[in-house]
């Protein structure tokens, strides 16, 4: 909204210096600062409110260190969503389809997560929202994003095709399969971030690193000169995603102020599902979905550990009559907790791994 207001003021009065409003880098920085200020100013008030209403229940099977985390409020994802949405609406071109698709994804899955958290911590319903209803919400969002982009002729030509990472000469045309692909990616990534949200700061920090790389990809994809030089698909409007991405990064960093160990608040499913859907939708819109195993590497590894654990347990139970486990506990971060690693050490090492994976994904820009 501020973009349109300041553009109008510039058109009428032409004050010096206001031309910076046309620069994506300026608005991305402004969006980041705005999101961070919102978190730091309103965060304590939101935490005080949540502390009286919604205390996170601790699972009996959780590691010993985790069971000490009592009387800590959840639903902190509300402050993340507030910061991103307000900042995005202020600084991005809200008329761009990419902008409202990302903002919609965050609100949509944030609402699904909110219902789940509310049922668990307020209504005391064990398990919260049924898994099938979460899947319905994820599939519906994927269908909206995939369907809109596929049937919009101006977007379909660009988004239904992609290049293979490390081999840019090979182009894949998804065709109608772009819609089920969008559904799968939205569902998989939002669940992956949800699984990763088990240690103080792990999901927020990993998301900040992941989305920061997506911000870079979005900026390059939306700039015709850079896209041509790097031999990547130029997508008009993708640059606006940079602004939202930086708002997400700043919101996650601001949330770490309160969520770093020892945490004062948890993001809950409200935050993890919202952030996961944002990562998925941004990757889809800027054609980096095939790079997600690197860009969202920690989330991918955490999910893989759960799949391997459950699959091996079922296989050995069927084969031997007794289920066996590969990891001491899944997701993987709990395995290291069981081994006696300090929570801060696990989180920081996972962040380092995520940085290395993101840097690897950035190498694809120069590979022909």
Swiss-Prot record:
Name by which UniProt lists this protein: Phospho-N-acetylmuramoyl-pentapeptide-transferase
Listed pathway(s): Cell wall biogenesis; peptidoglycan biosynthesis
HAMAP family membership: MraY
GO cellular component: plasma membrane
Function: Catalyzes the initial step of the lipid cycle reactions in the biosynthesis of the cell wall peptidoglycan: transfers peptidoglycan precursor phospho-MurNAc-pentapeptide from UDP-MurNAc-pentapeptide onto the lipid carrier undecaprenyl phosphate, yielding undecaprenyl-pyrophosphoryl-MurNAc-pentapeptide, known as lipid I.
Principal localisation: membrane
Keywords for the protein's UniProt record, in alphabetical order: Cell cycle, Cell division, Cell inner membrane, Cell membrane, Cell shape, Cell wall biogenesis/degradation, Magnesium, Membrane, Metal-binding, Peptidoglycan synthesis, Transferase, Transmembrane, Transmembrane helix
UniProt family annotation: Belongs to the glycosyltransferase 4 family. MraY subfamily.
GO biological process, any: regulation of cell shape
Pfam families, per the entry: Glycos_transf_4
Coiled coil: none
Swiss-Prot/TrEMBL catalytic activity: UDP-N-acetyl-alpha-D-muramoyl-L-alanyl-gamma-D-glutamyl-meso-2,6-diaminopimeloyl-D-alanyl-D-alanine + di-trans,octa-cis-undecaprenyl phosphate = di-trans,octa-cis-undecaprenyl diphospho-N-acetyl-alpha-D-muramoyl-L-alanyl-D-glutamyl-meso-2,6-diaminopimeloyl-D-alanyl-D-alanine + UMP
Cofactors, names only: Mg(2+)
Membrane topology term: Multi-pass membrane protein
One GO MF term attached to the UniProt entry: phospho-N-acetylmuramoyl-pentapeptide-transferase activity
Organism the protein comes from: Chloroherpeton thalassium (strain ATCC 35110 / GB-78)
């Amino acid at each position: 909204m501020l973009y349109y207001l300041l553009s109008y003021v510039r058109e009428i009065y032409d004050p010096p210096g206001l031309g910076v409003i046309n620069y994506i880098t300026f608005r991305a920085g402004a969006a980041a600062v705005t999101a961070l200020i919102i978190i730091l100013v309103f965060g304590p008030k939101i935490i005080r409110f949540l502390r009286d209403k919604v205390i996170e229940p601790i699972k009996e099977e959780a590691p010993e260190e985790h069971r000490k985390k009592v009387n800590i409020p959840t639903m902190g994802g509300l402050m993340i969503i507030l910061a991103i949405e307000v900042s995005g609406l202020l600084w991005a071109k809200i008329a761009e389809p990419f902008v409202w698709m990302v903002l919609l994804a965050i609100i949509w899955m944030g609402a699904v997560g909110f219902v789940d958290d509310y049922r668990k911590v307020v209504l005391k319903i064990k398990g919260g929202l049924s898994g099938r209803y979460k899947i319905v919400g994820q599939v519906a969002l994927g269908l909206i994003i995939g369907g809109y982009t596929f049937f919009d002729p101006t977007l379909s030509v660009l988004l239904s095709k992609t290049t293979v990472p490390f081999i840019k000469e090979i182009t894949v045309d998804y065709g109608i399969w772009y819609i089920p692909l969008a559904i799968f990616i939205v569902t998989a990534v939002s669940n992956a971030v949800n699984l990763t949200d088990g240690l103080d700061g792990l999901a927020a920090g990993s998301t900040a690193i992941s989305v920061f790389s997506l911000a870079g990809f979005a900026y390059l994809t939306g700039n015709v000169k850079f896209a041509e030089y790097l031999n990547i698909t130029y997508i008009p409007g993708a640059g606006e995603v940079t602004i939202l991405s930086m708002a997400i990064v700043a919101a996650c960093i601001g949330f770490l102020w309160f969520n770093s160990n020892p945490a004062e608040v948890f993001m809950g499913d409200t935050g993890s599902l919202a952030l996961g859907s944002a990562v998925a939708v941004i990757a889809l819109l800027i054609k980096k979905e095939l790079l997600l195993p690197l860009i969202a590497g920690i989330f991918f590894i955490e999910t893989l550990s759960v799949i391997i654990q459950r699959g091996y347990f079922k296989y050995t139970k069927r084969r031997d009559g007794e289920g066996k486990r590969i990891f001491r506990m899944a997701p993987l971060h709990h395995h290291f907790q069981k081994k006696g690693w300090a929570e801060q050490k696990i989180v920081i090492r996972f962040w380092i791994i995520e940085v290395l994976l993101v840097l690897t994904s950035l190498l694809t820009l120069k590979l022909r």
